[in-house]
Amino acid sequence: MDTKNATACMAALTCALLSAGTALGSTEAQKDAAISSGLAWLAGTQAANGSWCGSGYCAADTAAALLAFTEQRYKPGGWGAADYSANVTNALNFILRDASTIAIPNNRGDGNNPNISGSGIGYIWGGGEATYVTGLVLPALARVTAGVNGLSPTTVISGTGNASVDGRTYGQVIQDTVATFANGQTRADNAAWPGARGGWRYYPGDGQSDGSTAQWPAIGMLFAQAVPGVTVPAFVKNELRSWMDYIQNPNGGVGYDSPTSLVNESKTGGLLVQTAFTGYAGSVSGPGDDSDRAGAIAFLNARWTNAANSTWDGNFGHPYAMWSIYKGLESTIGLSGAEISNFLYAPAARIKDDPADVWNWWEDYSQYLVETQNADGSWDGYSYWTGAMAASWNINILNATEIPDGSDVPEPGTLALLAAGLAGLGSLRRRPA
């Protein structure tokens, strides 16, 4: 990257933002208070070993919390008067201690080489639910290297007690975690059924795919490819297109292991994450077929006000679905995308800093999360997704966590310069897109 030009661009952006006085919607003070309260609750419930473990998959809960602390640290105003540096360090050390390795070949069976670094290993977390858990860990690892606690991709890991990571850099661990997903992607030659090609299921390499699980490698690699020096092989994205075309129902929604099974909101949000990751919007076969990105968004808009139900279904009050949908919409239409218009809150009920602010789907989500937060800073969650998992995802929605688009990113030093220039803009989160 041309650092001089990048710095100049960042300075220009800073000036432009400083001259724009309009807040992005409903009460920013309420959002900030909810985030602060949520982070304080998380800090108070962290175990002595650095983990959170409410779901039974400790690395997953811990990674979700780590991402919440990390993303807020990068926002204007950061952690405020609190200092969560020790919480971040302890969570990160737990995750690194918990890492396991698998062998990565130079040919995964279809002529493609997933062994990008040449190390011959891949990192993995979560046992039988490894795709989910590793997909939660990878974004957290990627984001801490942008400067939290002085970490960068070239920082050498030490003192974890895990010989597989100690002595390696964060960038190397991130790259070899990408290799786990690249190697474990379902191939044409090992697919349990033809439509499974290109996706993932619970454990990488099991020859199966499902519409819920497949979003997690995609979101993990979206974050990973934004880390300087980390590469995601093009063949992974190309193969994923096959799965995307197969699993989407003609009504725009997404099924579980077939396009007609268990179609719901959360899996549809996951498909949008995959469109952002691959750059592929899907294709329609003719009139009445909404099997593409626009169809998925229309499916979500029509069901936007649905409450959590039947374990996996619904939107509002369902942490898994809301985080899935948030990731999908933020990465495709941005926070202010007008494609979602079937709002939960009627105009008279909308809380705004400025009556002239235009309502959007993110404000709809944010007001709901502010209103449903418990006095202690937690949220009730739903079904499997309670405690730290629910709180962490809700915090990341409220602070408008930006899903990387995979383009070249500034070095941490340039990002720090931008953050300094925006230090007074506590109410500003992300430009409309």
What would you call each of these model-derived segments?
Residues 430-433:
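Short, charged juxtamembrane terminal tails flanking transmembrane helices
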Residues 26-37, 45-86, 100-238, 245-367, ...:
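An alpha-helical repeat/solenoid feature that recognizes helix-turn-helix modules
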Residues 21-25:
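Sec/Tat signal peptide C-region and signal peptidase I cleavage site
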Residues 1-10:
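Bacterial N-terminal signal peptides that target proteins for export
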Residues 410-428:
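A short, hydrophobic C-terminal helix/tail in secreted or cell-surface proteins
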Residues 10-19:
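Bacterial N-terminal signal peptides
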